[in-house]
Amino acid sequence: MTHQDLSITAKLINGGVAGLVGVTCVFPIDLAKTRLQNQHGKAMYKGMIDCLMKTARAEGFFGMYRGAAVNLTLVTPEKAIKLAANDFFRRLLMEDGMQRNLKMEMLAGCGAGMCQVVVTCPMEMLKIQLQDAGRLAVHHQGSASAPSTSRSYTTGSASTHRRPSATLIAWELLRTQGLAGLYRGLGATLLRDIPFSIIYFPLFANLNNLGFNELAGKASFAHSFVSGCVAGSIAAVAVTPLDVLKTRIQTLKKGLGEDMYSGITDCARKLWIQEGPSAFMKGAGCRALVIAPLFGIAQGVYFIGIGERILKCFD
């Protein structure tokens, strides 16, 4: 294995490890974010803490980890692609010690955002259905006779009321809609992830460079971690309106009286008219609390060089 192959493999391992650790730590907050963004009209949850407490009471501790399995399975390739792609595009666009260029860094971030959606879109499509299942169950309690506009995951003609699984949802989507079913909301995902990467990667690089230590040849672990957290939280809040649109569009099953959306423009228009401009920032705090440690951990893993250490064991 050449040095370049070793470097790429190490980066993929680092991205995967960072994703697994990060998701395990912050998944309940991500679940709260999805449920807060999806509630229409009369609020079922007053905020993140209220959502987590009600979820724990109604569904138990593991109810807060609904959808975690699909995320843990796919977050490794997703984060690995995102971080490795950004690194690749940075090297491609800024060769031979070229001075830092904000435009080139933003282009590299754009490339990373475009690459990652291959995994991100189906992963979040499945995750959102599982995360929102508990909220929908409460919505429908005592309203079994009311007409519903939501889709059901069925096997045969009778509707099943069992807890949905990622495998069942994926199979139903593929059977009824083909591959396009798993990539529902692809445009909204691109619209969120490309701006996020354009903001995050250049911001992190410049913040991290402020703590560069000439003796060590890099910034300290603490500085890299904080830089990742700050850049991640700023980028996350900045694209929250786009994340709200993506979540609403990708949610297949709706509560009673909740709208279906034909696309990004239709979703934005209905959201503005029915819920007001503040609806576009639903879950912003949760999103910052999810993304900040995710990317702080990612940069910390890169700093420690876990991938390089693992590969050395096989030399």
Swiss-Prot record:
Solcar repeat residue numbers: 6-92, 100-210, 219-308
Record's keyword annotation contains Transmembrane: yes
Localization (cell): Mitochondrion inner membrane
Polar residues: bias regions: 142-159
Tissue and organ distribution: Expressed in brain, to a lesser extent in testis, and poorly in all the other tissues.
Family (UniProt): Belongs to the mitochondrial carrier (TC 2.A.29) family.
GO cellular component, one term: mitochondrion
Topology term for the membrane: Multi-pass membrane protein
Tagged with keyword RNA-binding: no
Pfam families: Mito_carr
Role summary: Responsible for the transport of glutamate from the cytosol into the mitochondrial matrix with the concomitant import of a proton (symport system).
Protein name: Mitochondrial glutamate carrier 2
Chain positions covered by the region annotation Disordered: 141-160
Sorted UniProt keywords: Membrane, Mitochondrion, Mitochondrion inner membrane, Phosphoprotein, Repeat, Symport, Transmembrane, Transmembrane helix, Transport
One MF annotation (Gene Ontology) recorded for this entry: amino acid:proton symporter activity
GO biological process: one example: malate-aspartate shuttle
Membrane-spanning residues: 12-32, 61-81, 106-126, 185-205, 225-245, 288-308
Sites bearing Phosphoserine, chain numbering: 145
